[in-house]
Amino acid sequence: MKNLIKIIFLITFSFSEEIDEDLAYQKVLEKLDGALPKSFVKKAFSHEGVKIHKEIAERFAKPYEKKAWSDYRKIFVKESRISAGAKFYKNNLKLISSVSEKYGVDPFIIVTIAGVESNYGVHHSQFSVFNALYSQIHDMPRRSKWATRELAEFLKYCFSDKLDTQEIGGSYAGAFGFGQFIPSSFTTYSVDFNDNGIREPYSWPDVLGSIANYLRLNGYSSNSEDYSKKGDIYKAIYAYNHADNYVM
């Protein structure tokens, strides 16, 4: 029995040492600077689901937004998505109108962003958010600093809402929810629109409210009608996704 306990201790100690040597763990722990219990952070990095996805770096090399407009348009501006948008608008008209009225944002812009980001909730999860950011820290030196900050923000969110750090899925970039917010944007711009005490990335009231709030706080003037490239609407949408194809 004593030998078994000794073996278990040695295995646990060895695994703990491996985590301590993990570059991503070191960077995130330093970024957090004591904001979270070290035990929680170590548990997140020792989760059995932690994995580096090599295909993520490949996806960044060929982003949709860098495609020619004609190719980009074929992906997002097609009959099936337009029909889905019309149906979503009809089914959620009261909510959409309420969000639009509160924030002074064009309702069709709110709906369109929801459509492009997750196809109205159909597509929103490819990798765990943790693994997407973890992979970037390890495999993409140019994105390592950014991914470190975002993973630190994600861990704060998981800790405050008592979530399993592998529970939330997202894009290869680490964005999550129906509005595809990166962690720092979610903690900064998300709202509890339905007043249930929780900001939920998969609840349409909160998602649509958060999209509108993001636009307003990034320069969208209330009830603006300036759709020009130099106008406030264009700039606010560009802030949501830094790509001209996205805004067009």
Please state what every model-predicted region is.
Residues G170-S184:
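Extracytoplasmic ligand-binding site segments that recognize negatively charged/polar headgroups
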Residues M1, K6, L10, F15-T148, ...:
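Cell-wall glycan-active module
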